[in-house]
Amino acid sequence: MISFIKGVLIEKDPTALLIDVNGIGYEVFVPMTTFYTLGDIDSQVSLYTHFVVREDAQQLYGFKSKVDKKVFQELIKVNGIGARTAIAILSGMDSKTLLHCIENKDYALLATVPGIGKKTAERLVVEIYDKLLKMANEIYAQTSGTTTTSQDSQAQQAPTSVVLANSIFNESVDALLALGYKQKDAEKMARSAMGDATTVAEVIRKALQGSIKSKR
């Protein structure tokens, strides 16, 4: 069981990282709330991890905090919620927002996550309600995962060429597709979030936040 990983960040794409640990490269899948907190390539990274073994694959999932890891582990215990859907949930909202959804039984907001319909949202609330409430103090104590990184802050001040903008748009669409959104929806979300955004992380963050706000 791999419960924690610390190493050098070699590659980072939305939802997937490559981390060098003493010469061995580990592919780690992460929610966007963790991706937002990462430093630059070649920087040190430490993640709490959950190892999933299936018949056709062995996959490692990483989280910025032990609390997010626990929430993920509770999510995948829910009937109909797999690891990919759990990652999509924690990409669209942090643990605190998820707790609010569960407390308020906000089925409509939960159903905005790709792969979750109304029935699955209702089942999720029923099955995870008590467990998440027991974790409330831990969830509220942790820092929000949507803090802008220094890299994002610097990027916001840099000019964006048409070529770079197109690259950011295409990468953002690919990331949203990886989270389970349909092509048409992913393009619409990325386009509406572009504005003056100059990084993929910034576009995706705005796109996911915009999707949540539109349902409230």
Swiss-Prot record:
Pfam families: HHH_5, RuvA_C, RuvA_N
Stretches for region Domain II: 65-143
UniProt-listed InterPro entries: DNA_helicase_Holl-junc_RuvA_I, Hlx-hairpin-Hlx_DNA-bd_motif, NA-bd_OB-fold, RuvA, RuvA_2-like, RuvA_C, RuvA_C_sf
Location of the region described as Domain I in the Swiss-Prot/TrEMBL record: 1-64
Keywords, in A-Z order: Cytoplasm, DNA damage, DNA recombination, DNA repair, DNA-binding
Record region (Domain III): 164-216
Protein's UniProt keywords contain Cytoplasm: yes
GO biological process assignments: DNA recombination; DNA repair
SMART domains: HhH1
Stored CDD domains: UBA_RuvA_C
Intracellular or extracellular location(s): Cytoplasm
Record carries keyword NAD: no
Region called Flexible linker, residue ranges: 144-163
GO molecular function: ATP binding; four-way junction DNA binding; four-way junction helicase activity
Gene Ontology cellular-component annotations: cytoplasm; Holliday junction helicase complex; Holliday junction resolvase complex
Top-level division of the source organism's lineage: Bacteria
Chief localization: cytoplasm
Assembly information from the UniProt record: Homotetramer. Forms an RuvA(8)-RuvB(12)-Holliday junction (HJ) complex. HJ DNA is sandwiched between 2 RuvA tetramers; dsDNA enters through RuvA and exits via RuvB. An RuvB hexamer assembles on each DNA strand where it exits the tetramer. Each RuvB hexamer is contacted by two RuvA subunits (via domain III) on 2 adjacent RuvB subunits; this complex drives branch migration. In the full resolvosome a probable DNA-RuvA(4)-RuvB(12)-RuvC(2) complex forms which resolves the HJ.
Role according to the record: The RuvA-RuvB-RuvC complex processes Holliday junction (HJ) DNA during genetic recombination and DNA repair, while the RuvA-RuvB complex plays an important role in the rescue of blocked DNA replication forks via replication fork reversal (RFR). RuvA specifically binds to HJ cruciform DNA, conferring on it an open structure. The RuvB hexamer acts as an ATP-dependent pump, pulling dsDNA into and through the RuvAB complex. HJ branch migration allows RuvC to scan DNA until it finds its consensus sequence, where it cleaves and resolves the cruciform DNA.
Family assignment from sequence similarity: Belongs to the RuvA family.
Domain notes: Has three domains with a flexible linker between the domains II and III and assumes an 'L' shape. Domain III is highly mobile and contacts RuvB.
Stated name of the protein: Holliday junction branch migration complex subunit RuvA
Native organism: Francisella tularensis subsp. tularensis (strain SCHU S4 / Schu 4)
Lineage: Bacteria, Pseudomonadati, Pseudomonadota, Gammaproteobacteria, Thiotrichales
